[in-house]
Amino acid sequence: MSKAVGAIAVGIALVAVAVFVPGVGTAIAGAAFSASAAAGATLSAATLAAIQAGAATLIVATGLTIAANGLQMARAANAISQAQLTRLNVSLDPSAPRKIAFGHTALATDLRASIPTGADQEYHEYVICVASHTVESITEIWFEDRQAWTVGGGIASYYSGYLTTVTVRNPGTNANGIAINSQWPATSTLTGCAYVYLKVKRTGNSKKAESVLPQGIPSRVTIIGKGMKVYDPRLDSTVTGGSGTHRADDQTTWEYSHSGTDIGNNPALQILAYRLGWQINSKLAVGKGMLPERLDLPSFITAANICDEPVTLAIGGTQRRYETHAVFSENDATSSVENALLFACAGRMTDHNGKLGIALAYNDLTGTLYEFDDDDVLGAFDWNPSPSIHETHNIIRGRWTDPSSNSLYQMVDYPAIRITSPDGIDRTLTIDLPVVQDGKRAQRIAKQILQREQYQGTFAAIFGIRAWGVKVGDPVKLTFDTLGFVEKLFRVVQQGI
């Protein structure tokens, strides 16, 4: 072992191994981060996460792991986008920010025109923008809790004669504008955006009849559809590990569904699409607009495959490991958008060799692990086995977005997840999962968070040059006589120069 070239400071965080969650399938907990290294540099901080099988009653076997900073990400992701909260209510706001929609969900309802028409203003016409990009489809419209229109069945009988026109523009172009009057001429096209035009009759169709929409459309309107098409590097033959015609720099090749399977609800691909951004007339409309060459595209292949893995449910059947469905706006901080999606797929962003990528939890403990011992630790160390009991929780409760007709994309509670408190005092953490639209999946994610929080110990020390052989996120073994560690499993969670 050489100590001549450089030193690496290493810190450790305890994590749990895979456990089984009654009723919701397999839960996962752990740690994984990214780092880069250059020969001869000196690292001031690197963090490892320790894995202790059998350390808690929930632990039954070595298995999958996820980010050790999951609790911090959970708190950040708990801030729900205003676009998500307000999308069920139509509002006329000239300064409303652009919206981006992912997955199969309730789309935005930005009212761009609200104009009374007719000789006696017996009609009212509306233009509602659902996304500042092309969407896959717009399939349903609901007024309050009543279905008003479907793409297959047209206008519902209850509204027949009063909801007189429903027209979808996906997207608006110079050739398909809808003329209402001088306030909204045919040249008002919302170019590149997906929108819906509605016309309602506010008076009865006979002397004795009354309109079911005398005040026009209600304030609560739900427009359901499938959102942004995504780029999938698995379908790109120019990317290592990919095969197909998708291209990161050509959004005409992007898809929501491929060969009958939805890919637009895959959180890894949504994050990639958000980073690439969506253009209208060669100008960035939504997203970050990053260049493909700045991205570690093969890492998104791995992450997308993990999201698509089937998880067996205790009640029978399977579901994809991770799916996300959400609406965001350009007013949202880019970090909050990414954190919301990352948190819902046990993910983290990486920066390795100058390229930004993604890493999701998976079982990487079965291969050959890098091993360190006393000779690798160059100086003083800091070992904090666990935080104060007052800083941990034994109960997690919160909400998820229910897409059923009973809730129509409102948030509802998932059953509280709990373990026994060490001192008998319950401490509750509230975690909302607005981008998750399945109750079982929400429970599974909440269980992961609770399990991770039980393993937050940290170890920090200066390591020798051999530590350049690992990168943040790697599991390693550490034998350290001072603390009695013998091939103790750890995971690198932070590394800095």
Q: What does each model-found stretch correspond to?
A:
Residues 1-4, 8-15, 19, 25, ...:
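Polar, S/T/G-rich
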